[in-house]
Amino acid sequence: LRNMATTGGNIMQRTRCPYFYDTTMPCNKRQPQSGCGAMEGYNRMHAIFGASEKCIAVHPSDMCVALAALNATVHVSGAKGEKKISFVDFHRLPGDTPQLDNNLQTGELITAVHIPANRFNKSYYLKVRDRLSYAFALVSVAVALEVSDGVIKSASIAMGGVAHKPWRLTVVEKFLIGKT
């Protein structure tokens, strides 16, 4: 899936952490209980939210940030049947098991991603990166707003490049309600 540029492959991307890809460095995500080289090393592009003592890697997907802001649902099928996982619950925080990126069980497969109908009539996506193309976000934000008569009625905001999963800003969402 990851090599075919599918939605499922995009959702399942592994971290871009250089310590994950450098097999000479410790990485709890790659080899549990080996340590996290990024903790004391170069960590400019690592998590500022939701990190743990075991891992400070971030999720690389731009698409996932937008899906989180749009309250998407991941449809999954496996030996135990079908289920739906809220997008904000699909990816895991590292905790004590940073090698587990998501909440799929062994043998489960993503079959669909559903974006529900909503009342959002304004949406924005902004990505800050080191170069103009083919670069991961240093930080990104997806914003979806329902605006009526110049007043924000509902808001949904997610950030990327800042956590092990797309990070919802629920406090900011609530703060924006009623603002002009």
Task: Show where each model-derived region lies.
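C-terminal structural segment of proteins
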Residues: 1-180
